[in-house]
């Protein structure tokens, strides 16, 4: 039966009555919340909001025609559903959790047997009574959507190949050598064709062979997996954003959930190696780190923490006789601790708490193993309350979910073990450790995994080719919102001895990645202790640079939460019409103002490695050469092992930490690097570092404005517990001529309050501790 549809406009409803009173109440609550957040944040644009989880669309956005249903989510995004059973999914699904968006303006009409839905960006045409199917031949005869792209009309229809898709990511880099994983990358949300499809149809396979499910009800407060209302239904989301890549990602996070901010400590240096360390050996590593003045924040206990090498839940007390004492000692030294898990084998009868768990599950006393069945809410409740909680009480800060063997569940057909483990572990921490930010370390589980940071990329091989492909892989993952990949810096496994230069280049690259973690397999010949290498001073400089850049990095993480644009992102986000932005795939933006072009080849006989670079249009500051250079060009340069090419956007202000050994302390002095070549601005974001308050406006921002020879530090906006009341600054004007004088707030400084380095051409201004609510103006005269 085809239902007649008259022309309508947004604000009218096709087939459901609007409950105006309820909607007005919703709007009042929303406006109050926005006003509250705006007051806290000072109206600076970084609006903190609780994560949206409202899957039922506004009825005004829905257009129904027979067995087809269309939901206009944004001017560029339309949901397409078709169900022969007349059953449409209104619950959250694995990728999409929120459809309650402001209704965009659109019109509908019937025309010559077609339903036409038009927004300001898209025109959808549906042949009334036509059947939409995923297995039909590619054709525009039943459904098509058209839009303008760079002055030409583009049409999509079911079955059309997206050959220009810019890709997303894949579950793991296990076995990566060079770019041998390229073919495994799943399609992303962005395409040079200007359109992409999110396919949440229940029969559609994800990259690991699993399918998407719905969320319905809860177990202990956690949204729980449920079967779709119609397994044969079509459930597509058409994204027609053209080359507005950042807008597409921002709107994706509106419907799929934001990228949560990880705890601050996670962005510091991790030590990790698959090796059976004893308590004394763990402590020796930490003491060596401190003796060598190496900044560090996280210690990983790989799988040998438990009695069975591969899997298990019980401490190996021959190696670690006092786990609580060891973890307390780590905490006392400023380190967080994570344990590795291979959970798929369940819980055997020789494990701690086995008898209690077996009894909780109502199993017979003859049962020797409680199987791993995380799709069972009863198992989740008992397993986590008995075993996971016991280890967390001992001080474990977060979990490394390393492998689930079976890609799909043995108990629920099509359920992806990776995605579901990530969902459960992350949300369990969110619900049960509310004084901390939830965090897990895991492999990619498919679209929607960005809600569960952070990513563990797996066991790659130690080769230059492997290193060379990882910049592309990491940046491209932002095309599905997965912004926190962590790699085994140095590679996981290797064929021969340690290569100090290759390790250095990996660490230099690692500075400009989301997670800064060294790791390797349990071959004793592989060394990951940087202080054991002949080039340790250079390796140490990479760690110091990482910690220096932390204010910039953490601010970029907040921006990712607000905008959906990840810390590492491809160049084509900012230069979508430049062919070089797509071709130079091992270059990427690290936040808004740093372009990174890592060295990924060995040095030649002259002790230098050549690299061909592209700089986009504009002016850039070449950090290696300490000079402003013009963009819109390709050039080749050579780099010693001491050098790694990265470029500041001209006019930027790059906020640095002073030298520090741990992120537990909040520095009372910051270094502001003022980049020549233009004007610009930056924002310094700060919060408590490991609470969920950042989602409710508990944070501060400080705006920094660079105009000509002047830097203005605007009064801080917002508040959070423990924030500094005053702060000193070291302001460095890079690569500039010596001024005649320097003033702060109109008062000329004496020579001791500022200096000039003739060799680096840097003006350094020392601003004493000043209340953070006071404006500071530093000017070169």
Question: PLM ranges: what are they?
Answer:
Residues 33-41:
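Bacterial N-terminal signal peptides
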Residues 73-112:
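A low-complexity, Ser/Thr/Gly/Pro-enriched, surface-exposed linker/loop concept
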Residues 109-263, 273, 279, 286-291, ...:
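Catalytic and substrate-binding clefts that recognize carbohydrates or anionic sugar/phosphate headgroups
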Residues 156, 295-539, 574-578, 584, ...:
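Aromatic- and carboxylate-enriched substrate-binding clefts and catalytic-loop regions
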Residues 426, 447-455, 470, 477-487, ...:
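Catalytic core of carbohydrate-active enzymes
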Residues 105-108, 745-771:
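Extracellular/luminal ectodomains and secreted, surface-exposed scaffolds of diverse proteins
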Residues 42-50:
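Sec-dependent signal peptide cleavage junction
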Residues 70, 78-80, 117-124, 595-598, ...:
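Short, well-ordered beta-strand segments enriched in hydrophobic/aromatic residues
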């Amino acid at each position: 039966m085809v239902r007649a549809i008259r022309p309508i406009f947004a604000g009218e409803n096709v087939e459901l009555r609007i409950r105006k009173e309820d909607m007005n109440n919703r709007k009042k609550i929303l406006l109050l919340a926005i006003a509250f957040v705006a007051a806290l944040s000072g109206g600076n644009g970084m609006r903190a909001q609780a994560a949206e989880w409202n899957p039922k669309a506004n009825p005004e956005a829905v257009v129904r025609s027979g067995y087809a249903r269309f939901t206009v989510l944004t001017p560029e995004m339309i949901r397409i559903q078709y169900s022969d059973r007349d059953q449409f999914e209104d619950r959250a699904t694995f990728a999409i959790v929120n459809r309650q968006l402001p209704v965009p303006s659109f019109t509908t009409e019937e025309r010559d047997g077609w339903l036409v839905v038009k927004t300001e960006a898209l025109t959808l045409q549906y042949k009334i009574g036509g059947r939409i199917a995923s297995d039909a031949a590619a054709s525009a005869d039943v459904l098509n959507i058209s839009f303008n792209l760079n002055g030409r009309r583009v049409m999509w229809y079911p079955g059309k190949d997206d050959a220009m898709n810019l890709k997303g990511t894949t579950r793991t880099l296990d076995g990566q050598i060079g770019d041998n994983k390229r073919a495994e990358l799943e399609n992303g949300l962005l395409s040079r064709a200007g359109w992409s499809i999110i396919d949440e149809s229940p029969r559609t396979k994800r990259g690991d062979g699993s399918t998407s499910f719905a969320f319905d009800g809860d177990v202990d407060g956690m949204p729980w997996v449920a079967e779709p209302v119609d397994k044969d239904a079509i459930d597509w989301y058409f994204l027609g954003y053209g080359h507005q890549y950042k807008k597409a990602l921002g709107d994706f996070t509106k419907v799929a959930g934001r990228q949560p901010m990880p705890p601050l400590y996670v962005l510091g240096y991790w030590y990790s190696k698959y090796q059976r360390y004893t308590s004394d050996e763990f402590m020796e590593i930490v003491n060596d780190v401190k003796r060598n003045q190496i900044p560090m924040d996280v210690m990983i206990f790989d799988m040998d923490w438990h009695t069975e090498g591969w899997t298990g839940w019980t401490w190996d007390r021959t190696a670690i006789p006092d786990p609580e004492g060891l973890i307390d000692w780590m905490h006392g030294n400023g380190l967080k601790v994570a344990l590795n898990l291979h959970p798929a084998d369940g819980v055997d009868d020789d494990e701690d708490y086995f008898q209690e768990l077996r009894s909780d599950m109502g199993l017979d006393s003859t049962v020797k193993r409680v199987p791993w069945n995380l799709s069972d809410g009863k198992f989740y409740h008992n397993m986590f309350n008995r075993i996971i909680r016991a280890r967390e009480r001992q001080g474990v800060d977060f979990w490394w979910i390393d492998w689930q063997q079976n890609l799909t569940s043995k108990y629920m057909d099509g359920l992806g073990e990776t995605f579901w483990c990530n969902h459960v572990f992350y949300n369990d921490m969110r619900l049960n450790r509310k004084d901390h930010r939830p965090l897990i370390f895991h492999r990619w589980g498919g679209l929607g995994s960005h809600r569960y940071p952070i990513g563990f990329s797996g066991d790659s091989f130690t080769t230059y080719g492997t290193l060379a492909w990882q910049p592309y892989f990491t940046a491209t993952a932002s095309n599905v919102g997965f912004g926190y990949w962590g790699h085994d810096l140095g590679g996981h496994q290797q064929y021969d001895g340690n290569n100090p230069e290759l390790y250095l280049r990996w660490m230099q690259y690692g500075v400009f990645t989301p997670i800064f973690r060294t790791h390797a397999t349990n071959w004793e010949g592989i060394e990951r202790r940087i202080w054991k290498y002949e080039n340790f001073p250079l390796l140490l400089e990479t760690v110091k640079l990482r910690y220096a850049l932390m204010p910039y990095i953490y601010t970029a993480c907040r921006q990712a939460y607000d905008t959906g644009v990840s810390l590492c992102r491809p160049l084509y986000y900012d230069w979508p019409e430049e062919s070089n932005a797509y071709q130079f795939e091992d270059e990427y933006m690290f936040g808004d103002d740093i372009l990174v072009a890592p060295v990924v080849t060995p040095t030649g006989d002259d002790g230098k490695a050549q690299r061909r670079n592209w700089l986009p249009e504009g002016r850039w500051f070449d950090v290696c050469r300490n000079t402003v250079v013009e963009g819109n060009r390709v050039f080749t340069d050579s780099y010693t092992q001491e050098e790694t090419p990265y470029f500041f956007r001209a006019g930027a202000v790059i906020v640095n930490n002073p030298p520090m050994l741990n992120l537990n302390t909040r520095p009372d002095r910051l270094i502001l690097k003022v980049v020549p070549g233009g004007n610009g601005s930056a924002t310094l974001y700060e919060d408590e570092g490991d609470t969920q308050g950042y989602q409710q406006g508990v944070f501060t921002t400080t705006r920094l404005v660079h105009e000509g020879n002047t830097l203005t530090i605007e009064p801080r906006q917002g508040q959070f517990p423990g924030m500094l009341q005053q702060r000193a600054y070291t302001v460095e004007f890079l690569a500039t001529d010596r001024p005649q004088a320097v003033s702060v707030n109109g008062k000329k400084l004496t020579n001791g309050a500022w200096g000039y380095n003739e060799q680096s051409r840097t003006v350094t201004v020392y601003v004493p501790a000043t209340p953070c609510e006071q404006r500071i103006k530093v000017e070169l005269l």
